[in-house]
From Swiss-Prot:
This is Paraxanthine methyltransferase 3. GO terms for molecular function: metal ion binding; methyltransferase activity. GO terms for biological process: methylation. The lineage of its organism: Eukaryota, Viridiplantae, Streptophyta, Embryophyta, Tracheophyta. Substrate binds at Y18, H21, S22, S23, Y24, Q25, Y146, A147, F148, Q149, F150, S300. Its cofactor is Mg(2+). Mg(2+) binds at N167, E252, F254, N255. Belongs to the methyltransferase superfamily. SABATH family. Keywords: Magnesium, Metal-binding, Methyltransferase, S-adenosyl-L-methionine, Transferase. Its EC number is 2.1.1.-.
Length: 352
């Protein structure tokens, strides 16, 4: 059994790149802007705003969303500073923004897209956000945008046919309690490592912003839009195995390092960690919703999952898989349309 490759979004600026197909995440950031302004205004101590202010995006990927995320933060900090001091932040604060992702992330595309009118200095920080990537007490605000949902590895036994934890599906559907517990245990461990690392890197009373998706308590993953589309990918891979295009064993051993937690699970993990206080746990209304157009859906999924499928099954099989996904999305239109909603969240944590 081969290990699951590292998950990196499709780079470049082509029609199937993550840069061109990350509007859903970007819409969440735009919808959250006012709430980010409010929580920074309320929870960021003015004493932390010095002549150098550092912001880090952990899991920045290669698309433009990271620029929206950090600009939201900078705008909020500047607004607070101007309102409470009466001084022009341009004269007194230099912003430093650190973009973190795995070393094989497409940082070239990322930096080629830097906004021309930006008011910050920037640098890449390659490395896994499950560990420390920055010096102690070196940043004032950190942000993770749709990155807190990843796990560092597949839970033990999940990909082993001889294990009682063997998962026939490519993700945690929520219908197998043993599989769900294994994924939750792995997610809890990884989340602890993330929070511990960020607590070291943040200055005292610094803020950590988490944006992403979680399940409403009691909802199973495969009852939601995101779970259904993952099921479509899995069904397409099974079809290719039946056609002899890819090996059945490879399909049955393929799982992704993703766990969409329930709201209550997230709260419990953060509270038990003890390094942060939850200052806000907001439900963000996604203005445009999920795409129901089968072609757009398939291309969007390819931008996020194409890299990992190509590494596991080969580029040709990956292309065929997403052709099948588009066809299956037509067939499952009603199921997608009536999927149970997930919660899009903004969690604001203050370092204790």
């Amino acid at each position: 059994m081969s290990p699951t490759p590292e998950w990196v979004m499709v780079g470049g600026e082509g029609p199937e790149s993550y840069k061109q197909h990350s509007s859903y995440q970007r819409d969440l950031l735009k919808a959250a802007k006012d709430k980010i302004n409010a929580v920074i205004s309320t929870n960021l101590s003015l004493n932390l705003i010095s002549n150098r202010f550092s912001v880090a995006d952990f899991g920045c990927a290669s698309g433009p969303n990271t620029f929206v995320a950090v600009q939201n933060i900078i705008d909020a900090v500047e607004e607070k500073y101007l309102r409470e001091t009466g001084q022009n932040p341009d004269d007194n604060i230099e912003f430093q923004v650190l973009f973190n992702d795995l070393s094989n992330n497409d940082f070239n595309t990322l930096f080629q897209g830097l906004p021309s009118g930006r008011r910050y200095y920037s640098a890449a920080i390659p490395g896994s956000f499950f560990d420390r990537v920055l010096p102690k007490h070196s940043i004032h605000i950190g942000v993770m945008n749709y990155a807190f949902q990843f796990t560092s590895k597949i839970p033990k036994g999940i990909s082993d046919r001889n294990s009682p934890l063997w998962n026939r599906d490519m993700h945690c559907t929520g219908f197998n309690n043993k599989v769900k517990k294994a994924y939750l245990d792995q997610f809890s461990l990884d989340s602890k490592n993330i929070l511990d690392a960020r607590a070291e890197e943040l200055v005292p009373e610094g803020l950590m912003l988490l944006l992403g998706s979680c399940l409403r308590d009691g909802i199973k993953m495969s009852e939601t839009y995101r779970g259904i589309v993952l099921d479509l990918i899995g069904a397409s891979l099974n079809d290719l195995a039946q056609q002899g295009v890819i090996e059945k064993d490879k399909v049955e051993s393929f799982n992704i390092t993703l766990y969409i937690a329930e709201e209550g699970e997230l709260r419990q993990i953060i509270e038990e960690n003890g390094k942060f206080t939850i200052e806000a746990f907001e439900d963000i209304i996604q203005p445009n919703g999920e795409s129901l157009d089968p072609k757009i859906l398939a291309v969007s999924l390819k931008s996020a999952f194409g890299g990992i499928l190509s590494a596991h099954f080969g580029a040709e099989a990956m292309m065929k898989a997403f052709e099948l996904v588009e066809a299956k999305a037509h067939q499952e239109f009603s199921r997608l349309q009536n999927a149970k909603p997930t919660m899009q969240y903004l969690i604001v944590l203050r370092k204790n």
